[in-house]
C-alpha cells in the first residue's frame, strides 16, 4: 500500500459560533484519487481551502509531504496545485497569457515556462485556442484552462474543487477522462464533488462529508457494505403528485426498511425490491399517488449517504 502524501487530524474551522468543519481526519495516499463527497455546504471547499493554505485552521493539524500547515505554508504551496470551484482567469487575456501569469506566480520563467505552457495546453486539448481571449471561451474550456494552471508547476498533489459544476456534458466527460489520465501518470488528486456518479467513476477511496463532519471513509466496496444487502426503490410520480407527506406510510410494508421523500420523489431502502414492489404500488394507489416510473438500484454511494444521514445528496 502507498504511503500518505496528506494527513489531517481533527481539522476544524469556525467562524464565530458557526462550525464549518468539525474535526475532520483522513489521509490521501500517493497516486490515488481521493474524493470528498457531500452536498453543497457540507464543508468540502472549506477543507480544501485550509489544505491549500488559503484559510488558517481554527485547530487541528495537516501535513502534506512532511510539511506542516500552516507553519510551512510556503513549502506546501510549491508542491500543490489548485483547481478552484470559481474560474480564476482574466477574461481579457488569452489562454497563454493567463497561464503565463500563473507560471510567474510559481516563480517559473524563460524556456522552462514556455515548455510547460505548450505541454499543459496540449494536455487540456486547447493548443489551437492558446492565443484567443478567455472571454470567448465556453464554460467547459475555461474549466480546462483552470486545470492547466493548476498543473503548470508539476505539483505532487492536485486539489480539484467541484471542477465540473455548470458545464455541458461533453466538457464534463473530457474533464473526468483527464482526471483519470492524471492518476495514470502518477498524480495524486483530492477531488470534491456532490455528484455521486463522479465519485463512483473516479475514486480509489471516498470520504463522505456532511455538516462539516467526515461520516464515513473507505473504498467504494467498503462503503457499500455499510448498506448491507439492501436495494433502493426510487419512485417518480406524475405531475402534481408528490410523496412528501406520505413517505412514512410506506414503512408499514413488510421488507421496507426506510423511506425518504426527496424533491417529491420517494426513495425506499428495501430488503428485496421485487418482493416489495406489489405492496409499494398498492400503497401508492391507495394514497392517490400516480406513479410515472420506478427505478431499482443496487447499493451505491447515494444509498450509503442516504443510509448514514437520512437524506439525499442533493436534498439541500
What are these regions (language model features)?
Residues 60-71, 75-76:
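Conserved ABC transporter NBD signature motif
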Residues 100, 104-107, 111-129:
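Conserved ABC ATPase "signature" region
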Residues 154:
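Conserved catalytic motifs of ABC-family nucleotide-binding domains
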Residues 158-161:
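Catalytic Walker B motif of ABC-type/P-loop ATPase nucleotide-binding domains
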Residues 176-271:
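ABC transporter nucleotide-binding domain
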Amino acid at each position: 500500500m502507498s504511503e500518505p502524501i496528506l494527513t489531517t487530524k481533527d481539522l476544524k474551522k469556525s467562524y464565530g459560533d458557526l462550525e464549518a468543519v468539525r474535526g475532520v481526519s483522513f489521509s490521501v495516499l500517493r497516486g490515488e484519487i481521493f474524493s470528498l463527497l457531500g452536498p453543497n455546504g457540507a464543508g468540502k471547499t472549506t477543507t480544501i481551502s485550509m489544505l491549500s493554505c488559503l484559510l488558517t485552521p481554527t485547530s487541528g493539524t495537516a501535513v502534506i509531504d512532511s510539511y506542516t500547515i500552516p507553519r510551512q505554508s510556503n513549502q506546501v504551496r510549491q508542491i500543490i496545485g489548485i483547481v478552484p470551484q470559481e474560474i480564476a482567469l482574466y477574461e481579457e487575456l488569452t489562454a497563454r497569457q493567463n497561464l503565463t501569469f500563473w507560471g510567474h506566480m510559481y516563480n517559473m520563467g524563460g524556456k522552462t515556462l514556455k515548455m510547460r505552457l505548450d505541454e499543459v495546453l496540449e494536455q487540456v486539448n486547447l493548443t489551437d485556442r492558446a492565443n484567443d481571449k478567455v472571454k470567448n471561451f465556453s464554460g467547459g474550456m475555461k474549466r480546462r484552462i483552470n486545470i492547466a494552471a493548476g498543473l503548470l508547476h508539476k505539483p505532487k498533489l492536485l486539489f480539484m474543487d467541484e471542477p465540473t459544476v455548470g458545464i455541458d456534458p461533453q466538457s464534463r466527460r473530457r474533464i473526468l477522462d483527464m482526471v483519470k489520465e492524471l492518476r495514470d501518470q502518477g498524480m495524486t488528486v483530492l477531488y470534491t464533488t456532490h455528484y455521486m456518479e463522479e465519485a463512483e467513476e473516479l475514486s480509489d477511496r471516498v470520504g463522505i462529508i456532511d455538516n462539516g463532519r467526515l461520516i464515513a471513509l473507505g473504498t467504494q466496496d467498503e462503503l457499500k457494505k455499510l448498506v448491507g444487502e439492501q436495494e433502493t426503490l426510487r419512485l417518480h410520480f406524475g405531475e402534481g403528485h408528490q410523496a412528501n407527506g406520505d413517505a412514512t406510510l410506506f414503512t408499514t410494508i413488510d421488507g421496507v426498511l426506510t423511506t425518504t421523500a426527496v424533491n417529491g420523489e420517494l426513495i425506499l431502502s428495501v430488503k428485496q425490491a421485487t418482493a416489495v414492489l406489489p405492496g409499494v404500488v398498492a400503497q401508492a394507489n391507495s394514497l392517490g399517488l400516480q406513479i410515472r416510473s420506478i427505478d431499482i438500484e443496487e447499493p451505491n454511494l447515494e444509498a450509503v449517504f442516504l443510509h448514514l444521514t437520512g437524506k439525499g445528496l442533493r436534498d439541500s
